[in-house]
Amino acid sequence: MISVLKICTKDQKGLIYRISDVIFKYHINIVKNDEFVGEGMFFFRALLEGEFDKEAFIGTLEAMLGQEALIELCEKRKKDIVVFATKESHCLGDLLIKHYSNELEANIKAVISNHNSLKDLVEKFEIPYHFISAENLDRKEQENQILKCLEQYKFDYLVLAKYMRILSPDFVRHFEGKIINIHHSFLPAFIGANPYKQAFERGVKIIGATAHFVNNNLDEGPIITQAVSPVNHEFTW
């Protein structure tokens, strides 16, 4: 079995050696590890292979690093996600195809949309589709229906794939750190609606896409990953 070990603690000399020594003493194999230091803090992430007493292992690390250290150990697995969409199919379609071909490092448990236009597409992939209309409902009423729908699923993240509605502060707080948005610009540039139009009008030479966690500031949550593509004067928006 592969486990993921994550450690965050104050930087000091010899941490890599001391952590590796604990791992060795528990007869665990390190498949991969990464570490870096920033602003006086040490961050460590490793993939561990082997069977071992996890509670005893964590206890040994805590005794060695101190109670202020943040230590997390979990099984490596695909994350379970619920996707929110509206009417546009390209983002959702890409996720569905990658999920179908096993390229997506996640399991799509369901799709929720405020329109019914993508139902046939989603059900072709044998994934549950929930149409929760926003018509004649205020935002709180619609989000309460979404919350009720989500109760039937166990999931790690909610993924917004061109979900063209702004979530309420209460909803975001309810799932703090668990909502991921895909925004079609190289954030922090071109926040909000029509980022391609904004980029075109500014005459930029690269455009991008950003996956980020959602907070209550529009398109300003912590960035997870980004990609860019070059453009020139021949492009339009």
List the model feature ranges, each with a label.
Residues 10-31:
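Short amphipathic alpha-helix segments
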Residues 2, 19, 74-77:
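FNR-like FAD-binding dehydrogenase module
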Residues 1-10:
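Short glycine-/aliphatic-rich beta-strand segments at the starts of folded cytosolic domains
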Residues 2, 30, 106-108:
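A broad structural signal for short, well-ordered beta-strand segments within beta-sheet-rich domains
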